[in-house]
Design a protein with these regions (language model features):
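Active-site beta-alpha connecting loops in nucleotide-dependent enzymes
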Residues: 41-44, 324-327, 349-420, 430, ...
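P-loop/Walker A phosphate-binding loop and immediately adjacent motor/lid segment at beta-alpha junctions
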Residues: 51-52, 56-57, 62, 72, ...
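Phosphate-binding loop of NTP-binding sites
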Residues: 82-232, 238-246, 299, 308, ...
């Protein structure tokens, strides 16, 4: 069978024969009738797996470099772009049947995705969700593997939403997902920016590149888009505004923007404020989650919900019912008053925001337990140490997912930013570090464990090792005394 009999591309896009049974970039997922797209990645080149894919039943191969194979090979200038186009064609271009919302930014993306989905659902809008924690398609709920899935998975999730009768999809969009074309062939009706702070410079090299990668989401707004919702207090706001392809741009913030929070009262477990800019008069709001950063997230959610047709008062009132986000500010306490918090904060800005929030929880010392990913931006490591030392009296450095790096070297690079007067230790075993912090903390102290949130494994030299921070917290609290929920309605630390 010739390539043209199986698939071809014209001005309208790719056309696939009924003989095609699927599209994938992973040779291990190939089944008879599949198209295998050979993608060059950071560690592996898909062209090296063409033989394996053909033996598994691939009927055609798409790639950038010709490879001798007993099946048709279609050469393309960009394998990743072709992968997105082929996946969309295979699943019947599901995004065209949905109102798609994209949420990007360094910190806060997952919370905004979860909370906007909740607000839309409470307003009667049938909404699916793709986040870095979970995917909900209307047909099923499953754990996420990447912040933004590879395009064959993402297109399948959108197809399930369409086929389940959902009308809206809220997608967490990472800078990697944008640059690697994972969101290719998806037109967005609304794009949201939380913030842009230091992250992923191992991949983007400069903050300018990183910011411009985020801005590309706003270029994907469809002509009939509801517009963009951006953090007007963020330094990247003007760049994002300039890249918005369609619709009005609505800014939100505490200091700038069309939608603002005034009369802000940050309380230990919640926040109260008045939302201005969504109607003729200010709307009182209560948010059952701590921290100034969550006020920003809530403003983004309310502004976006109104752009999507939710009545302003209803959108703001729903903020009071927003549920916990897995791995974000999960709180437990010991009977003698030690508070333990598990959070995903993994950037200097995110860590600082989390520490500022927990400072309000109790009067005692703050203990932090964290590490840094191996193979990632090394420049942020001492900055993380400086941020931790600014708030915490005790800093316990440990492993995150070191990958192929030496955990002791990673810890030393973080420790370079920690002044000598701060109690700083390196305990390689993460569960042991958590145990030590919980056992040595005194009543009234706070133990903040960050970097991994709900993740269930650590990676050492390509090997995944089970490790759940919340489980380690429960074990440590059991040694000290039974764990109790910290506050009615708060999420207890458990997996």
């Amino acid at each position: 069978m010739h390539g043209g009999d199986l698939l071809y591309k014209d001005d309208r896009g790719w056309h696939l024969s009924p003989a095609v049974q699927g599209v994938t970039l992973d040779s291990r997922e190939v089944r008879p009738g599949y198209i295998f797209v050979a993608v060059k990645g950071a560690h592996h080149d898909g062209h090296a797996y063409v033989g394996e894919a053909v033996r598994a039943g691939a009927v055609a191969v798409v790639g950038e470099t010709p490879v001798a194979a007993p099946v048709p090979f279609i050469r393309v200038p960009s394998a990743r772009r072709a992968l997105a186009e082929l996946a969309a064609a295979w699943w019947g271009h599901p995004a065209r049947s949905l109102t798609v919302v994209g949420v990007t930014g360094t910190n806060g993306k997952t919370s905004v995705v979860y909370w906007l989905t909740q607000v839309l659902r409470e307003a009667g809008i049938r909404t699916g969700m793709v986040s870095s924690v979970a995917v909900e398609t209307g047909r099923r709920t499953l754990a996420a593997r990447l912040t933004t899935p590879e395009s064959p998975d993402l297109q399948r999730y959108l197809a399930e939403m369409r086929d389940s009768g959902l009308t809206h999809a809220v997608i967490e969009v990472s800078s990697h997902g944008i640059v690697q074309e994972r969101i290719g062939e998806i037109g967005f009706h609304l794009a949201i920016l939380t913030n842009v702070t230091r992250e992923h410079l191992d991949f983007h090299l400069t903050m300018e590149n990183y910011m411009l990668a985020k801005a590309r989401l706003f270029e994907r707004l469809v002509p009939e888009a509801r517009g963009a919702v951006i953090n007007a207090d963020d330094a990247s706001a003007s760049v994002m505004r300039s890249h918005a392809a369609a619709g009005p741009v609505v800014g939100y913030g505490l200091d700038a923007g069309e939608v603002r929070a005034r009369a802000l009262r940050l309380e230990a477990w919640s926040s109260r404020f008045v939302v201005e800019g969504l109607g003729d008069r200010g709307l009182p709001a209560r948010l059952p989650h701590p921290g100034r950063y969550n006020v920003y997230n809530a403003l983004a959610v309310a502004a976006a919900a109104v752009r999507l047709g939710v009545e302003p008062r209803r959108a703001v009132e729903t903020l009071a019912r927003l549920g916990p986000v897995p791995g974000r500010m999960q709180i437990a306490r010991s009977p003698d008053g030690v508070l333990v918090v598990v959070d995903y904060a993994h950037t200097p800005d995110g860590l600082g925001q989390a520490l500022a929030a927990v400072r309000r929880f109790a009067p005692g010392d703050i203990w932090t337990v964290f590490g840094a990913r191996g193979g990632r931006d090394r420049g942020k490591r001492p900055e993380m140490g400086r941020v931790a030392a600014r708030w915490a009296r005790h800093v316990l450095l440990t492993t995150d997912s070191p990958n192929d790096e030496d955990p002791a070297v990673i810890a030393a690079e973080i420790a370079a930013g920690i002044p000598g007067e701060v109690d700083s230790r390196f305990i390689a075993d993460r569960a042991e570090a958590i145990r030590v912090a919980v056992e040595e903390a005194r009543p009234g102290d706070i133990v903040l464990i960050t970097g991994r949130g709900p993740e269930r494994t650590q990676t050492f030299h390509g090997r995944a090792v089970p490790m759940v921070d919340a489980d380690a917290v429960q074990a440590a609290l059991a040694r000290r005394g039974a764990a109790l929920p910290a506050e009615p309605g708060r999420e207890e630390c458990r997996s």
